[in-house]
């Protein structure tokens, strides 16, 4: 199992952070096998103690509801506890990963 799998499997809550098109570097970091993914990232404190990244389009706080084994992968299902939309970010376009590259919606 990977570092990321163990982090998700052993936690009560997790967060989904919706990045904007100028934040591909964060997506690349968290998609890597590095174990220091959270180093030098600014976070927002919150009641569920989940890693909400500062200056993202939106953050979704989830309870770790279920983990389903699917072949050699696992699917984590979260029960949404809270959604935050950041109206103060300057770039409003979400970062999309499609066709092995990062893109923006047009």
Model-based region annotation:
Residues 1-106:
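Basic, polyanion-binding surface patches
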């Amino acid at each position: 199992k990977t570092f990321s799998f163990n982090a998700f499997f052993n936690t009560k809550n997790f967060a989904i952070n919706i990045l904007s098109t100028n934040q591909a570097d964060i997506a690349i970091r968290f998609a890597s096998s590095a174990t220091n993914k959270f180093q030098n990232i600014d976070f927002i404190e919150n009641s569920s103690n989940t890693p909400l990244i500062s200056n993202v389009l939106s953050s979704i706080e989830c309870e770790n509801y279920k983990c389903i084994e699917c072949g050699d992968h696992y699917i984590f299902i979260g029960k949404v506890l809270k959604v935050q939309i950041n109206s103060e970010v300057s770039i409003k376009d979400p970062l999309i990963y499609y066709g092995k590259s990062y893109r923006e919606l047009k």
